[in-house]
Amino acid sequence: EMLRSLVGSEMCIRDRTLYQIQWKYRDEARPRYGLLRSREFLMSDGYSFDRDEAGMDVSYMNEYGAYERIFTRCGLDYRIVEADNGPIGGSRSHEFSALSNVGESELAHCPECGYAATLERAECVDDEPVQEEMEELKSVYTPGTKTIEDVCNYLHMDVKKSIKALMFVTYDDELNPAEYVCAFVRGDREVNMIKLVNALGIPEHYIEFANEDEMGATTGCVGGFTGPVGLQNCKIVVDSELVGTVNMCAGANKEDHHMTGVCYGRDYKGDIVTDIKVLKEGERCPKCGKPVIEHSRGIEVGQIFKLGTKYSESMKAFYKDENGNDCVYQMGCYGIGITRTLQAIIEQHNDENLSLIHI
């Protein structure tokens, strides 16, 4: 807000980038790894204000290049990855991540084409559905088979022919329960929570796993035996890979029972259909298509964002154009964790002979 006031007070057409370096304080629940996650840390924050999107793009890439040079000169082995914008918002973000086994960022990377993204942001390439004749929908007795592995072993079925269900409850701005959500992915997949909340259009902290009994009373689901057929009073989110699948196995919403012959479109449909799964190692790269995706961990040392007009509109960061009209700035924001960068350097360059005099 202070920087917005500085820029807005000039009331002129002038693209600019401002920065600040200051100590910040956070009520960190689990401080750990020295300077990596502490309650007190030093940050460098930059903000760009441009008259149009083209100018914002230039400012963004200027900061991108500057961060590359900074971390290279620091001697870091780092990777630039596409990142989720998270609560900050905006249209695009890149994270600068120093590779380290103690890092909290999970990364997906293609060694062939260079595609890289945080695991929460990484796109998936859907497998093509198997073409076969639709079978009759049947309810099958499957006693004690509450996990995907249990039911697939019991029915002698490939796990890729099963449907996994996860049940959630979402909250409104007053943190009152808003609605139940059931997310469905193929049995060998995991739900990507960031993709799910983005699909729902809610903040990450507005969702949690539902109480099975409470949700069952409203929707008809049964813990361990939940499936998409016949669910009521809940939002159904279906992973895009399930579209077109036939003869799948899913919970029957009845204790000790599953449905076989489940076909998308005939037996159920999603209220929301999109990619909500985690990109696994060895899967196809979303950019070049080669099945060589690798996972690694990294320390987030910097991140940059294209914010657009999200904050400039709400904070009335205007400039006067050539005709004297009020126009909204296109904003970008850019941050480097200075103390975290120091810790990342130590993590990558330490040995048994390291002492404080060498730092």
Language model regions located:
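Single conserved hydrophobic/aromatic residue that forms the stacking wall/gate
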Residues: 1-8, 13, 357-358
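Extended, low-hydrophobicity, polar/charged segments
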Residues: 9-10, 30-46, 51-341, 348, ...
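Carboxylate/His-rich catalytic cores and anion/metal-binding grooves
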Residues: 20
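Acidic/histidine-enriched segments that form metal/cofactor-coordinating
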Residues: 17, 25
